[in-house]
Regions:
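Bacterial Sec-dependent N-terminal signal peptides
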Residues: 1-24
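Non-catalytic, glycine-rich low-complexity segments
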Residues: 23-40, 51-94, 107, 145-214, ...
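Accessory beta-strand-rich segments of carbohydrate-active enzymes
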Residues: 27-29, 36-39, 82-187, 209-210, ...
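Extended substrate-binding grooves/exosites of carbohydrate-active enzymes
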Residues: 37, 55-70, 120, 125, ...
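Short flexible loop/turn segments that cap and initiate beta-strands
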Residues: 46-49, 214-219, 232, 262-268, ...
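Short, hydrophobic beta-strand segments
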Residues: 136-138, 249-258, 667-674, 767-786
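Extended acidic/polar, glycine-enriched regions
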Residues: 141, 203-295, 669, 675-676, ...
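Beta-strand-rich structural segments
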Residues: 202-206, 272, 631-635, 682-683, ...
Length: 810
């Protein structure tokens, strides 16, 4: 949720500026941090000398700079995230803050953070993916300098993917008057929604840190998307000394506009606390009016409209940027997915950055908000004797922080927890504990636990939650048979494996086949033994329309989990750990957001109103002249005719009744004798020509091309431009086999934030100024400075014409 009077300052020593009303001041603590990796028992003391420490900005991931450990664990990215780290920052708290309540709010610290103010422990937290806050009023010294120190320790954190390390999400300092709205203190619901009206119920937790009882007026005002006032009310409540009380307000909203995918209308509530007729606090909360129901036989309805979930799972890293949260990087990920036809996100497998939910609210994406992977060290549970306490405080922060987001339609309390699914005693008790706390803090949404052990349904763990969520291979079928009165979602679908731009022959007859290439063919026919290709999930949803939809594993490639080329695979094949990859092959797009072929398969099915005609593979196969090179076409059309050098190779049509899923959703010419030249496909839909697409045999690369996703970015020190690097032939065609070494230079008001080529086998530094093209492409990420002007990025390589692009920093 957004807090009022948002203020960002970027000096090494942060100065706070109060508003004239002296209400609520929210400051992002992003700059002026000192960092040192390792253990240091004195680092929390104010007089400790940190002059030799690294100056960093927060959010910060200390491990993403590497170096890669070739003998390390590919499952967590082969990066040095295990260890200890210290952060220190000087805060100058103005004298005017005397008498105020001061909080520190951390969106996420990996892991087991300890927070110190002026040498004293302010508090601890454990779960690295969850947000937490501390009241530091008694520890700070208004009118002077204060030392904030944060210790992070990832040694006892366990992970199946790259988690990052350090203060990887936003930190805020919040100064409020003694009477104020609590952190995450509003809860907005719409219990009655009709075409002409909606009842908006606003619960507000108001805190009084004075030593005497206070009577205050709580005023609620609703504003529409244009900023016009559309409703208000107020009530008087008494709050005991050093206590809190709840205000319950109801406003009738006339002719409400609904929030839904495709039309995500947001309202906002401004909550004002008045003491003696003076406003002492203001707090703003966006919300949406929407009615969501999920039925066992007909799936999901939003505002009485059937919506098939076309979702993706997203891990929290941003490739070359690591785990450090960046708003633009997140926004770009969602834009790429939404353009494909995606309408939903699952936050696998942890509570997300709050900005992700803000973006989903604004963009109209539905969300399964998931809090844990397992109930063990992956959730930073190192001692289960206090499980009730752990569950209570973590579920409280998770749900209370997120419950006003209209995008969230389902709470998930965990993923693939075998010890819970198969343990009717201890495991089921843990599950019931988690669900109990979710339902206490939000009774308006349904709950689930994501399952993978099909036979465990016989123990009926689904009796405790609301929706069947199962991963892979129609494993939902038994649970559906045993309990048909609950809706079904495929919470992880596909897990198709591929490497962008890479193809192998012949086509595999075994989906799990691996080769010495350490890559996976982009014909989209590979998957792990437990999973399936995309077409299978499309078919199951067509044949079983009660299934509410799917969440593909995954939207983006991510660091870690490099199935199939893991350390275990290397060992089984008598190879060293050095051959294990650093990042996944699961993504619909690569680690940089460059689409794989599979992107267009999903787009053709999920976004059928937009023309898609995509040919694969590329047509540069000099070693295969006269040999077979199968050609696939992904299109939203029904049929297509393929031509090679002007000669028709026949017309193919999809077969919607086929038991072979690929015949329903792809057009395949499996016997094409390769000759260089031009491959053209003409697609048809309902008998009418839809369009055509051409792939040519390219010449040798002669020039580079730089293509920024945006040429104008904000001069805020955070905004990003993702600049695609490509090698072209003399006719301007992208050379699909180019692997030139590229040198990047940058001048002007920007810095190089990251660089990568999407190759899971690349161990080049993400912070280098050199990159090798991977099948003709790579990506450099440029971050703006805080000063307006321009920045010019240039790319050079031996033997090719260089390229440059100028960005406006505004």
């Amino acid at each position: 949720m957004k807090l009022a009077n948002f203020l960002v300052l970027s000096f090494f020593v942060l100065f706070f500026v109060q508003s004239a009303v002296a209400q609520r001041t929210v400051s992002v603590l992003d700059s002026g941090w000192k960092f040192s990796e390792g253990s240091n028992e004195q680092a929390f003391l104010p007089d400790f000398n940190d002059a030799g420490w690294q100056t960093v900005e927060v959010p910060h991931d200390w491990a993403i700079e590497g170096p890669f450990d070739m003998a390390g664990n590919g499952s967590t990215g082969k990066l040095p995230w295990k260890g200890e780290g210290w952060y220190r920052k000087n805060l100058e708290i103005p004298a005017g803050f005397a008498g105020k309540t001061i909080y520190l709010l951390f969106d996420g610290v990996m892991a087991f953070p300890q927070v110190f103010i002026n040498g004293q422990l302010a508090g601890k937290w454990d779960y690295g993916y969850n947000s937490f806050y501390l009241d530091v009023t008694k520890l700070v010294q208004p009118g002077g300098e204060n030392l904030l120190a944060v210790y992070a320790d990832t040694r006892n954190h366990d992970s199946r993917w790259y988690p990052g390390a350090g203060i990887y999400r936003k930190v805020q300092l919040i100064a409020v008057n003694p009477v104020h709205v609590d952190i995450w203190g509003t809860y907005i619901t719409t219990p009655v929604i009709k075409p002409h009206m909606a009842t908006v119920q606003i619960e507000t937790s108001v805190r009084n840190n004075n030593s005497v009882e206070k009577q205050v007026v709580v005023k609620q005002t609703i504003f529409n998307k244009k900023g016009y006032k559309v409703g208000e009310t107020s009530e008087t409540i008494a709050i005991s000394a050093t206590g809190n009380n709840q205000s319950n307000s109801v406003i009738t909203l006339l002719n409400p506009e609904r929030w839904e995918p495709g039309n995500p209308v947001l309202y906002s509530v401004k909550t004002e606390i008045l003491e003696n007729n003076q406003i002492v606090d203001t707090y703003e909360t966006p919300f949406g009016v929407r009615e969501i129901r999920i039925t066992p036989d007909h799936g999901l309805y939003v505002n009485d409209k059937r919506v098939q979930l076309k979702g993706v799972n997203l891990h929290h890293d941003f490739g070359a940027l690591g785990a450090a949260f960046n708003y633009r990087a997140m926004q770009r990920q969602l834009e790429i997915m939404q353009e494909m036809g995606c309408n939903a996100v699952r936050t696998s497998h942890n509570s997300p950055a709050p900005e992700l939910l803000d973006l989903c609210d604004k963009m109209g994406l539905l969300v399964i908000d998931e809090v844990f992977d397992k109930y063990d060290a992956k959730a930073d549970i190192t001692d289960t004797t206090n499980f009730e306490n752990f569950a209570h405080r973590n579920i409280r922060n998770f749900v209370v922080r997120d419950r006003n987001h209209p995008s969230i339609f389902l709470w998930s309390v965990g993923n693939e927890m075998g010890d819970v699914q198969w343990d009717k005693n201890g495991g089921f008790n843990k599950l019931k504990t988690m669900l109990k706390w979710v339902e206490q803090f939000d009774s308006t949404r349904l709950t689930t636990m994501v399952c993978d052990s099909k036979e465990s349904a016989k123990l009926r763990h689904f009796d405790f939650y609301d929706v069947h969520c199962w991963n892979y291979g129609r494993r939902y079928s038994l649970a559906r048979e045993m309990e048909p009165n609950k809706a079904v979602i495929i919470s992880e679908s596909a897990s198709t494996l591929s490497t962008r731009g890479f193809y192998e022959f012949p086509l595999p007859t075994d989906k799990t086949k691996t080769t010495k290439s350490l890559q996976v063919s982009s014909y989209d026919l590979h998957a792990p033994y437990w999973a399936e290709i995309a077409d299978d999930d499309f078919m199951w949803q067509q044949d079983e329309p009660y299934v509410a939809g799917e969440f593909v594993w995954t939207g983006f490639d991510y660091l870690g989990e490099p199935e199939p080329y893991t350390n275990m695979w290397a060992k089984q094949n008598g190879l060293s750990d050095s051959v294990a990859s650093r990042s996944s092959y699961f993504g619909i797009v690569d680690l940089n957001g460059i689409p794989k072929d599979r992107y267009f398969l999903y787009k053709s099915y999920w976004n059928p109103e937009e023309t898609t005609i995509h040919i694969l593979p590329h047509w540069n196969w000099p070693e295969r002249v006269g040999q077979n090179v199968p050609v696939f076409v992904y299109t939203n059309g029904d049929c297509a005719e393929l031509f090679l050098n002007g000669k028709s190779l026949g017309k193919k049509c999809k077969n919607p009744q086929s038991a072979n899923s690929t015949e329903r959703f792809r057009l395949m010419w499996n016997e094409v004798v390769y000759q260089p030249g031009e491959l053209k496909v003409v697609a048809y839909k309902e008998g009418e020509m839809l369009g055509e697409s051409i792939v040519k045999t390219t010449g040798e690369p002669v020039q580079l091309l730089l293509t920024p996703d945006r040429t104008e970015i904000a001069a805020d020190g955070k905004d990003l431009s993702f600049v695609l690097i490509e090698a072209l032939d003399k006719d301007g065609n992208v050379c699909p086999l180019a692997d030139n070494n590229i040198k990047i230079s940058l001048s002007g008001n920007a810095t190089l934030a990251g660089i990568d080529n999407g190759n899971p086998q690349s161990f080049s530094s993400f912070k280098s100024d050199n990159i090798k093209l991977f099948y003709g492409k790579a990506m450099v990420i440029i971050k703006s400075a805080e000063k307006a002007g321009t920045a010019t990025v240039a790319a050079v390589t031996d033997g090719l014409k260089s390229a440059e692009s100028t960005l406006e920093i505004q």
